[in-house]
Amino acid sequence: MQKQEEMKMKDYFSVKGKNAIVTGASSGLGRQFAICLAEQGANVMICARRVEKLEEVKKEIDKYGVKCIVAPCDVTKTEQIKACVATAEKEFGRIDILINNAATGIVAPTVDYTDEQWETMMATNVNGLFYFAREVGKVMLKQHYGRIVNIGSFHCVVTMNGVPRCAYSTTKGAVMMMTKALAAEWAKEGITVNVIGPGYFDSEMSAAVTDEKYESGIRNGCPMGRRGKPGELNGAMLYLASDASSYVTGQLLLVDGGWTIV
């Protein structure tokens, strides 16, 4: 990292030449994050289960002349995560940024929620983020440098009246506390750990929702009256992934169109 006194303002937000891992990168927010990092000059490993989708993302990234590694990975499988991190360290030489984005959402009334659904939510949304942070953390501790950006949700602090999101909100609350605990543990090691709390954003999952009452609830509940667009999270991600946030750690950055202020 450049010395603070030598840096110009544009350098603070630069990720040029940095090496990043983005999980859940085959679609939605993860895809946007990976392409954004590449556009800004970072080398990127893209991880997800759907290899064919990752190859499509790689075609977009290749336009920017950076190194891109496609890494098939199920974040509930620790051996696959270890293999991804080992490959990234070998191919990149170091790992500067982890965008811990992979997640799933199963919405159902609590009394109807099956054990399998609960375990799937926990395995993906909590365990997967922890396993990736743990393995990447081993590399970052050797470097005495790293930026970990967990993707949580505004549902870690509020919920939506009448919507059965107990399991989902529980996992995102866990991500917030995991972020704080890791940030405190690694604060003196040059590693920052923060979490972004998106509100309702356009995604593959949201596109499948056809309940107008539900959509109306989102529009009426959000002061901006709409869902966010994936690109509207890129600024927050770049801030936390760059040296602009070098004195920021353990924080929740809400990007929710004002949902949590009312």
Q: For each of these PLM feature ranges, what is it?
A:
Residues 6-14, 238, 249-262:
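Short C-terminal tail/terminal secondary-structure segment
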Residues 26-27:
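Conserved glycine-rich cofactor-binding loop
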Residues 109-110, 114-122, 164, 206, ...:
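Substrate-binding pocket helix/loop in short-chain dehydrogenase/reductase
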Residues 133, 171, 179:
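Active-site helix of classical SDR
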Residues 138, 184-188, 246:
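Alpha-helical segment proximal to the catalytic Tyr-Lys
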Residues 153:
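Residue(s) in the substrate-gating loop at a strand-loop-helix junction
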Residues 222-233, 244:
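A conserved structural motif in NAD(P)-dependent oxidoreductases
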